[in-house]
């Protein structure tokens, strides 16, 4: 990966391909009233944030007190929660997306056209046959450049199995979860490879598709202003993706590109 890489927003005319041209849309969804309220409230001092110690609370059937907002955990970590709706989407489509988009900057830009700049995987497994969608991203690292709020960030996101943080398959099945995307996060410029942040996107089936309950757990001392930035960013990219993922999935799966 070139540390002096040049990046830009959007997909330029000569960068489009057969996948990205039909689905790239610069326009992004407005924030919902619930998300605006969560941002305006600011740091929730009336409750504690979720971290790995109480992550299994997500397995409870009811919603938790904090589904949209941010709070400090007992150990000082900053915990950020966002819930998004995915109508007509299956958990299998979301697993497919994480294995499919990881190989290409242009595919990554479909997700949040006004914030995503660059993506490169540690391993390009797109031509490896016999892999499941989950095997295409679990164990892999995605190096991404993106705006989070006004901050231009260069991140390393390393995906791992949910069982590594206590979310075993049987428990997830019993709680009606179809998949959980888990990763550790750090700076792609950190040559030591230190990754102290965590992200969890828990995808639960609903009668109309599924819902994603996202949690970001960031180290003690993380500035509180990252709370509103990440709520805005995550809600926008996930809601934008939910708007076209079923069509993209069908297009890629059923079109003969030979």
Regions found by a protein language model. Name each.
Residues 1-26:
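Intrinsically disordered, low-structural-confidence terminal and linker regions
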Residues 2, 18, 38-132:
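Hydrophobic ligand-binding cavity/cleft-lining segments
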Residues 23, 27-30, 47-50:
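Charged, glycine/proline-rich intrinsically disordered loops and linkers
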Residues 65-72, 83, 162-169, 200-204:
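Short amphipathic beta-strand and strand-loop transition segments with alternating hydrophobic
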Residues 116-192:
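Glycine-rich portal/gate segments that line the openings of hydrophobic small-molecule binding cavities
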